[in-house]
């Protein structure tokens, strides 16, 4: 019986802040929070990868089994480099193409 590969989910997240948040700073904050909450082993199982960032909206990738955990990580981010922020998941999809299409329609 064939083994199915790892399924991925793509999460669109929006950053609310009075100041501009850089792409690198956001993705580093997410990665640091993953390591803080779940450790190195959990971080490897989550399969987190930054994909895209533009105008305060980012797309990240994770393993489909770890979507609730990555949502918890994102909700725990309250500041990035001393800048107070609120980060929220706005949409989840199985493909980048569909996710971008849904974001464009909103």
Where do the model's predicted regions map?
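Helix N-cap motif at beta-to-alpha junctions
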Residues: 61-68
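RNA-recognition motif
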Residues: 47-54
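A short beta-strand motif that forms part of the nucleic acid-binding face
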Residues: 64, 74, 93
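Arginine/glycine-rich "motif VI" loop of SF2 helicases in the C-terminal RecA-like domain
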Residues: 78-83
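Short amphipathic alpha-helices in soluble, non-transmembrane regions
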Residues: 30, 70-77
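Short, conserved catalytic or adaptor-binding loops enriched in Gly and charged residues
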Residues: 41
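Intrinsically disordered, low-complexity polar/charged tails and linkers
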Residues: 1-37, 45, 84-106
């Amino acid at each position: 019986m064939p083994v199915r590969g790892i399924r991925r989910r793509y999460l669109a997240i929006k950053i609310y802040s009075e100041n501009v948040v850089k792409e690198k700073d956001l993705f580093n904050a997410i990665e640091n929070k993953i390591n803080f909450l779940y450790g190195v082993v959990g971080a490897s199982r989550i399969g987190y990868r930054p994909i895209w960032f533009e105008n305060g909206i980012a797309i990240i990738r994770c393993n489909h089994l770890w979507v609730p955990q990555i949502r918890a990580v994102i909700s725990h981010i309250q500041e990035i480099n001393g800048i107070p922020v609120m980060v929220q998941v706005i949409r989840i999809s199985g493909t980048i193409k569909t996710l971008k299409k849904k974001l464009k329609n909103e």
